[in-house]
Swiss-Prot record:
It is an enzyme of class 4 (lyase). It catalyses: (1R,6R)-6-hydroxy-2-succinyl-cyclohexa-2,4-diene-1-carboxylate = 2-succinylbenzoate + H2O. The gene is menC. Converts 2-succinyl-6-hydroxy-2,4-cyclohexadiene-1-carboxylate (SHCHC) to 2-succinylbenzoate (OSB). Keywords: Lyase, Magnesium, Menaquinone biosynthesis, Metal-binding. It comes from Klebsiella pneumoniae subsp. pneumoniae (strain ATCC 700721 / MGH 78578). This is o-succinylbenzoate synthase. One of its GO terms (biological process) is menaquinone biosynthetic process. It holds the Pfam family MR_MLE_C.
Length: 321
């Protein structure tokens, strides 16, 4: 006998979370829980405002229709909305025992605000020291100075930078001007520095700073090809689609010798623990980009190891099905 349940949830967010110039006061999403006999599987569906093509309401409609059809014995195709396809495919993978339990809970800590806050945490990190810095939110010159300071202060640090296409070519050059050329090889990559891929490629050629594709992966004309200066791709499964599509993209990138970073779209702790399992499975050599739980006021259903945030159980969820 099949049982499918759909829950809606809301978590308060840290006051400082701004996405695409809008403040995110709460994180809202859905869970699907599939049960068949003794087996069960969970998945998270949480479109990210300003980034996902679908709204939460659209995702909810598609999810409920799929869940009802599956419960009634059908094998419905995955919905087209990326977050819904991803969440359902994770629940199916858990149900079928296809999503390994081993997880990569290492985090590339997210440095936002004062770089002094990061020094102690990084200095205490065992093994590979990798951190992420969001750039493009302030003046490009300030960003360059902060990045230079971090690389100078911690000699074995590798930085991942994310500009979210914020810079014109001129601003990107202003940033690079303040990063000592001797340190630039320790910038693991800079995600999407400019508004167009062509400008980003030119930036890499002119500065020697490696770049990574993120938003580009979700554009219709994107193709996986080896390009000078491109070192990595960043895959956000909630924005990508089904687990199968994520696997295909990882395989295509690895075939070209590119690093692949599995990255958060600010999922709940349940979704983040699944992403940690996907990272351990598909990208075991690469620290994932999952350091977003601290932006939230609580965890849901499944806790992240060593997080001090309170954990809310199923009783805190709103049942829809």
């Amino acid at each position: 006998m099949r049982v499918s349940q759909v829950y809606r949830w809301q978590i308060p967010m840290d006051a400082g979370v701004v996405l695409r110039e809008r403040r995110l006061k709460t994180r809202d999403g859905l869970f699907i829980r599939l049960q068949e006999g003794e087996r069960e599987g969970w998945g998270e569906i949480s479109p990210l405002p300003g980034f996902s093509v679908e709204t939460l309401e659209e995702a909810q409609m598609a999810l409920l229709a799929w869940a009802q059809a599956w419960r009634d014995g059908a094998e419905p195709p995955l919905p087209t909305q990326p977050s819904v396809a991803f969440g359902i495919s994770c629940a199916q993978a858990e149900l079928g025992g296809e999503l390994p339990q081993a997880a990569d809970y290492r985090a590339a800590p997210l440095c936002s605000g004062d770089p002094d806050e990061l020094f102690a945490r990084l200095a205490a990190m065992p093994g590979e020291k990798v951190a992420k810095v969001k750039v493009g939110l302030w003046e490009a010159v300030r960003d360059g100075m902060v990045v230079n300071l971090l690389l100078e202060a911690i000699p074995d640090l590798q930085l991942r930078l994310d500009a979210n296409r914020a810079w014109t070519p001129l601003k990107a050059q202003q940033f690079a001007k303040y990063v000592n050329p001797a340190y630039r090889q320790r910038i693991a990559f800079l995600e999407e520095p400019c508004k167009t891929r062509e400008d980003s490629r030119a930036f890499s050629r002119e500065t020697g700073i490696a770049i990574a594709w993120d938003e580009s992966l979700r554009e219709a004309d994107f193709r996986f090809v080896a390009e000078p200066g491109v070192r990595a791709v960043v895959i956000k499964p909630t924005l990508t689609g089904s687990l199968q599509k994520v696997q295909q993209q990882v395989a295509a990138a690895h075939a070209l010798g590119l690093s692949v970073v599995i990255s958060s779209s600010i999922e709940s702790s349940l979704g983040l623990t699944q992403l940690a399992r996907i990272a351990a499975w598909l990208t075991p050599q690469t620290i994932p980009g999952l350091d977003t739980l601290s932006l939230m006021g609580a965890q849901l259903v499944r806790p992240w190891p060593e997080s001090a945030l309170p954990v809310l159980n199923i009783d805190a969820l709103e049942p829809l099905l």
